[in-house]
Amino acid sequence: MNHPDWQLLAEKAALYLYPRRCPFCGAVLGRDAVQGTVCPACFEAADKRLVHLPPRLPETEHAFYALNSAVAAYYYSGEVRHAILACKRGGELWRARELADRMAVLIWGAMPSQTPGRRPAALAPVGMPRYHYIVPVPPREPLPGTAGMPLLLARRLGILIQTPVLAPLYSTKPLQPQKELTRAERLANKKDAYACRPGTDLSGKRVLLVDDIITTGATVSACALALQQAGAYEITAAAVAATEELPKSLQKSTEKRK
């Protein structure tokens, strides 16, 4: 006998009290929402101009190690940058759910809902699961009393692709803010900066490592190394956005909007 999906039913009921909003501008989604999750204006501004195609990140732009692959839904620019900062620093935590829904559609090909605010339908993997666990990157400075953005993204993705979430990673040393550091300094700052809690056993597991932004790749790589040391044999890093130079075609379209 099929049991009802109580979480899905609760989401549908919550739509009447707390309407879903566009992850980029915050507007309440109407019947004209594109793919059920983005207002038409932001679809033109973000999804048509800032989507990272293909999602896989080139190693020439990053300094990856200990990872099998890395993917992102968007380039870190414009409306996407605004949405991430509003979530991380502005306390608008609801944006993490909406951005995770976009990740599911753009990275893993989930079927977008045709009804505004409804969750996208993940395509069930055939045979063995795509990932055994989803693991969030531990945030350096989460807002007081809140989960960090990577954990919020991981929880939503766990629902969408039906994969359990683990949070075994922790920082082993004080970390400097990465923003002002050079590429070499970022790598040194993150070297041996993470470990898995004692007793964590990921032997033979495929792990999806989730962060909000991938810049040099220093953070996700250092986390991946810790997961490897706990036994993980295949690790994919995924983020809402990646910091890379925009392709020339996107640079031109972005300049036209200014």
Model-predicted segments: where are they?
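Glycine-rich phosphate/pyrophosphate-handling loop used in enzymes and phosphotransfer proteins
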Residues: 1-211, 215-258
